[in-house]
Amino acid sequence: TKTRGIAVTYRAGERDIYGTCPTSCEMNCSGKGSQKIDPDYFAALLDAVPRRGVSFTYTHFAWHLWADRSDKDSTGQTVVNFSAKTLLSAAAASRVVPAVVVLPATEWIKGKYTSAPLLGGTNNRGDFIQTDAVRVVRCPAEYKENFSCGDCGSGSPLCARADRDYIIGFTAHGASKRKAADPETSGGCYADGGHVRLHWDATAKSDQDDETDADKLRRFAKGLKSGSIIRHHVAGDIG
């Protein structure tokens, strides 16, 4: 799997797998979720980096809601990637925060890269003419055999590089890949099926104690060995 060899976390609402996800996420067709970010959890997320290690995650919450709290130029902080709905929105966001996007398999050039329009305009026929673009690099684990996040970047995964000048692209996959690849269609969350869904369900059904998600996360990161890599909330979000 992509996450072989690294530490991962899951997050869910109480008895509600989508409870921490934004209601605005196009992949969330549950009708449930959160309309705001949990500030205590988000602060803990930024701090939850193993000693001499790196952490990264993704969020579907609009980047302008959290960008001022996540320093793109800071080291020793969890890298929060904005999961964009389209190539155009990914390109715009990438000027401020690290960005990723889900694409159909047909989008890739030679199977490894494409570009996202950053600037341009329309001609007198209404056609969009691109004048600038941002490079989109496909996740290497999608085309390299026996390759995982633990192998990526020699201990510095691409998604954990806050100062990168390119977007990371993922290919829509699974039973709902058509929905995932279409920003106009609701649904398609990869975590809503398979083994990820089993772990996500277990997280939502687990008994809640007095320890907050923020405290649990800090404790988890602190307990990992030096040099570890964490992918935070494989499923779930910062709400």
PLM feature segments, named:
Residues 1-239:
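Class I S-adenosyl-L-methionine
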